[in-house]
Amino acid sequence: MSERAPVVTIDGPSGAGKGTIAHLLAKHYGWQLLDSGAIYRVLALAALHHNVELENEEAITLLAAHLDVQFLAGGDKDAIKVVLEGEDVTGAIRTQECSNAASKVAAFPRVREALLRRQRAFCQAPGLIADGRDMGTVVFPTAPAKLYLTASAEERAQRRYNQLQDKGFDVKIDRLLAEIQERDDRDMNRPVAPLVPADDALVIDTTGIGIDDVFAQCVAHINDKLSASGF
C-alpha cells in the first residue's frame, strides 16, 4: 500500500452531477472532500465583499494568497459547510452571480497558481475526493482514479433551474441555458487549464441517467483503479 493518501478526481461542467457524486463517494469511502469550485466561488465572493474588480488580476491574486477559507462537516442538508473569514457562506456562494464570477476569476493564471497549493493541501489520509474542473489534469495529475461527468447543456440548465426554484429564486430557464453555454465556452477555451477530460479519466454522460446508476459506475471504476494502484 502506498504511503500517500489516494485521490479520486471528478471533473466536468457545471450541473453534470459532480457535487452530488462527490458527496456520495466521500460518505461511501469515509474520505476527505474538496469542492474546488467552492474555493473559486469563495474567492469571487470575497472579491465582491471587498469591492475588488473581477477584471483586476493583481488584486484578485493578492486576495487569493490571503484567502481565509475552511471546509467544515455540516448536517444532513449541507454535506460541507463553507466558511469565509469566520462567516458561513455555504448558501451565498451558490448563487448564479457568484457562479459566473467564479468562472471569471478562475481564468487568471496567477490566481489559479495562488490557489493550487491550497487545493493540494486537502490531500490527507485516509483519502480525498476532489471535485472540480481541472482536478485530474492539473491539481492531481497522478491520481489513481479519475472521473469526468458531463451532460447536455439543456439538462444541466433544467437541473439548475429546479435547484434555484426549490430555494425560492425567480429564474428563467432560457437565461440559465445561455449562461451555461457561455460558461462552457469560456471554460473549455481558456488558455490555462481548460475544461477537458484527463486522458486516463472515465467519461460518464449523465444525461437521462439516474444518480444511483452513475454512482455504481463510479464506485466500480474507483475500486478497480485503487486495487490496481495498490491501495
UniProtKB/Swiss-Prot annotation:
<dbReference type="InterPro" id="IPR003136">
    <property type="entry name" value="Cytidylate_kin"/>
</dbReference>
<dbReference type="Pfam" id="PF02224">
    <property type="entry name" value="Cytidylate_kin"/>
</dbReference>
<dbReference type="GO" id="GO:0015949">
    <property type="term" value="P:nucleobase-containing small molecule interconversion"/>
</dbReference>
<keyword id="KW-0067">ATP-binding</keyword>
<protein>
    <recommendedName>
        <fullName>Cytidylate kinase</fullName>
        <ecNumber>2.7.4.25</ecNumber>
    </recommendedName>
</protein>
<dbReference type="InterPro" id="IPR027417">
    <property type="entry name" value="P-loop_NTPase"/>
</dbReference>
<dbReference type="GO" id="GO:0005524">
    <property type="term" value="F:ATP binding"/>
</dbReference>
<dbReference type="GO" id="GO:0006220">
    <property type="term" value="P:pyrimidine nucleotide metabolic process"/>
</dbReference>
<keyword id="KW-0963">Cytoplasm</keyword>
<dbReference type="GO" id="GO:0036431">
    <property type="term" value="F:dCMP kinase activity"/>
</dbReference>
<dbReference type="GO" id="GO:0005829">
    <property type="term" value="C:cytosol"/>
</dbReference>
<keyword id="KW-0808">Transferase</keyword>
<keyword id="KW-0418">Kinase</keyword>
<comment type="similarity">
    <text>Belongs to the cytidylate kinase family. Type 1 subfamily.</text>
</comment>
<feature type="binding site">
    <location>
        <begin position="12"/>
        <end position="20"/>
    </location>
    <ligand>
        <name>ATP</name>
    </ligand>
</feature>
<keyword id="KW-0547">Nucleotide-binding</keyword>
<dbReference type="InterPro" id="IPR011994">
    <property type="entry name" value="Cytidylate_kinase_dom"/>
</dbReference>
<dbReference type="GO" id="GO:0036430">
    <property type="term" value="F:CMP kinase activity"/>
</dbReference>
